[in-house]
């Protein structure tokens, strides 16, 4: 398993998964190298998207594994590789988030992430269950 920085060749795959992104956003992923495709046996199996908060904290704001590749440890491996990449770039801590009704929070805690807050977007254009944030010192 490996993760590779998103290129223009990955656009159809990434945009079929991430419904939050438009053409401008995708071009930004490529330009800033803030997106990764997760590969297993020469197949695209998922994506990771991150941004850098306050110029010094990588925040993984999207992780998705295709249904047929779930429960095989790919998300765990991808997160560990991503963390190592962020550490190699000199970052000291990472953030991850997920909705309170999603199971990913259990994986994040198993990987050493600590709950550090949440956001509620009730009665806004972004209405959703609470978003829980996790931090990890690298």
Segments from the language model and where they lie:
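Conserved N-terminal entry element of GNAT/NAT acetyltransferase domains
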Residues: 1-9, 136-138
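Active-site beta-strand termini and strand-to-loop segments that position acidic
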Residues: 39-41, 135-138
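Short hydrophobic clusters on alpha-helical segments that form packing/core surfaces
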Residues: 60, 82-86, 104
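Conserved acetyl-CoA-binding loop-helix of GNAT-fold acetyltransferases
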Residues: 65, 71-84, 110
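Conserved catalytic-core motifs of GNAT/GCN5-like acyltransferases
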Residues: 95-97, 114-131
């Amino acid at each position: 398993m490996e993760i590779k920085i998103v290129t223009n060749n990955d656009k159809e795959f990434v945009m079929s998964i991430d419904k939050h992104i438009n053409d401008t956003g995708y071009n930004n992923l490529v330009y800033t190298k803030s997106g990764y495709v997760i590969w297993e046996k020469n197949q695209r199996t998922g994506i990771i998207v991150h941004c850098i908060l306050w110029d010094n904290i990588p925040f993984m704001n999207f992780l998705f594994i295709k249904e047929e590749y779930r429960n095989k440890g790919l998300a765990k491996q991808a997160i560990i590789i991503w963390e190592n990449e962020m550490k190699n770039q000199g970052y000291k801590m990472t953030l991850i988030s997920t909705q309170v009704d999603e199971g990913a929070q259990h994986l994040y805690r198993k990987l050493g992430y600590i709950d550090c807050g949440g956001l509620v977007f009730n009665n806004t254009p972004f209405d959703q269950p609470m978003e829980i944030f996790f931090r990890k010192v690298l």
